[in-house]
Structures are given as structure tokens and as C-alpha cells.
Amino acid sequence: MAALIPGHPTPIAPNAWRVLGRNPGMMTGPGTNSYLVGDRALTVIDPGPVDHEHTQALLHAAEKIGRPIEQILVTHTHRDHSPGARELAEASAARLLGPDVPDDGLQDETWAPERRLRHGERVDCGGTELEVIATPGHVGNHLCYLMVDQNLLFTGD
């Protein structure tokens, strides 16, 4: 397995890359995992916390891969997974898709998806398909995404 270097895209499967966030800690391990998925265009899963350098790393990764970022999905709205979505969307003109924000005061209240995703739905990610799987438990709005052609599950936490 390749070394995890924050900000650098690491291939994990055909049409899937991981970019490690720069927020190591007790709750995040080496940092939040952000993913870029797609064949003709990219979907970012979990853009991470507000961190301009991480946003730039995701944009540079897309440039290196040679595909535009068209969508941003989050697995849940904890502050280490979704707050970076707004800056990334503004920089890439990507659409925001994912869960609603629970009204418990513990979530990223800046998250506002253009489209709410539901269990069983399928999302086209530039020629690669993700199936939405509702997995409440860690937090009530938690979603996982199954990359159907690779049988690869993006779980968030």
C-alpha cells in the first residue's frame, strides 16, 4: 500500500482516488479521507473541514487526473467531513448532494445540498455509478456510497 501523504491523490481502484486531509487527530486518525470517483468526470466524497489547502489539493488532484469535478457528496455532516464542500463547490461549480442536516446542534449547519439523497438511489458519477446506502448509527443522517462496478464501499466514519 502506498504511503498516505496529505494532499496527494492515491489510486485505490480504477476510477477512484483518496486524498488525505491535513487534520490528524484522535477522532480523525491520520486525517479525513476525501475521495474522487468517476470515469469522465469526478465526484468528490467528503471534502473535509474548512481548509483552503485541502480544497486546493482536491482541485489539483482533479487536474492531475484530468477530469472536472462535477458533484460533491458527503457521508454525513460532522465538521470533519462536510464544511469544505462550500469552498470546493464555488471553485469548481460542482453540485452538492447528500443528507439533510439533523437539528441537534452538533452538525455542520452550513451544509445545504441541492439534492437530498435517499437509500437505494443511484448517482451517476461521470460514468461510474454509486448506490446510496443509509447507515444511521454514527449519526442519524449517515450515508455510505457503494461504487457498484468495483464493489467498493465509501463509509465515511
Model-derived features: positions:
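Conserved beta-strand hairpin/beta-sheet module of binuclear metal-dependent hydrolase folds
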Residues: 7-65, 144-155
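Core dinuclear metal-dependent hydrolase active-site scaffold
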Residues: 18, 122-148, 152
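Residues at the C-termini of beta-strands that transition into short coil/loop
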Residues: 20-22, 100, 136
